[in-house]
Amino acid sequence: MTRVALTSAVNLAKKLQEAGIRHPAVLKAISHTPRELFLDNALAHKAYENTALPIGQGQTISQPYIVARMTELLLQHQPQKVLEVGTGSGYQAAILAQLVPELCTIERIKGLQIQARQRLKRLDLHNVSFKYGDGWQGWPNRSPFDGIMVTAAAAKVPEALLSQLAEGGVLIIPVGEETQQLMRFTRRSDRFSSEVIETVKFVPLVNGELA
């Protein structure tokens, strides 16, 4: 990580702290992650702005505040094994991989998955398992998970993801179509409590179609 990138990442973490992010480990991970690595060169100058940016294939790299907020919500439950649905650029995975012992991540667009794998390897993050597949179905043979994070909006909550939560596990997911709410579901035996966190805007979670 260059000195310029490090300074920019540290400044981004400070902005997120001012915006309400409080978890010190999340802020540290943001400050140590070169966001420009996850963007095309043409957009690298915007890497440390607190905004979502296109990454091709109709997908985006999420706004840093949302990345940090979802991570903070997940870490409140001290997960040991986490599933990310929607690898995308790999930026969210890079943040999570610094904070949890084991990360599994699924992407339905092959080209994005290949790029993300290469980027995390460059960052020497080796506690990540990648899967090319339909995130709507989760990763049954690697379940149960202490935490599941979905980085695209589902019109309804996928039952498969709820079923793959461990006891006490949490699912962080944007739900809705035009109007979306970031929600947290917590498993207690065969029951699930839900909590609305805030209004968000994500690309849709596609069911079944691989690209």
Swiss-Prot record:
A GO CC term assigned to this protein in UniProt: cytoplasm
Class of the enzyme per the UniProt entry, highest EC level: transferase
Keywords (A to Z) from UniProt: Cytoplasm, Methyltransferase, S-adenosyl-L-methionine, Transferase
PROSITE patterns: PCMT
Catalytic residue list: 62
GO molecular function, one term: protein-L-isoaspartate (D-aspartate) O-methyltransferase activity
CDD domains, A to Z: AdoMet_MTases
Catalysed conversion reaction: [protein]-L-isoaspartate + S-adenosyl-L-methionine = [protein]-L-isoaspartate alpha-methyl ester + S-adenosyl-L-homocysteine
EC number per UniProt: 2.1.1.77
GO BP annotation list: methylation; protein modification process; protein repair
Localisation: Cytoplasm
Domain of life: Bacteria
Biological role stated in the UniProt entry: Catalyzes the methyl esterification of L-isoaspartyl residues in peptides and proteins that result from spontaneous decomposition of normal L-aspartyl and L-asparaginyl residues. It plays a role in the repair and/or degradation of damaged proteins.
UniProt similarity note: Belongs to the methyltransferase superfamily. L-isoaspartyl/D-aspartyl protein methyltransferase family.
Name of the protein in its database record: Protein-L-isoaspartate O-methyltransferase
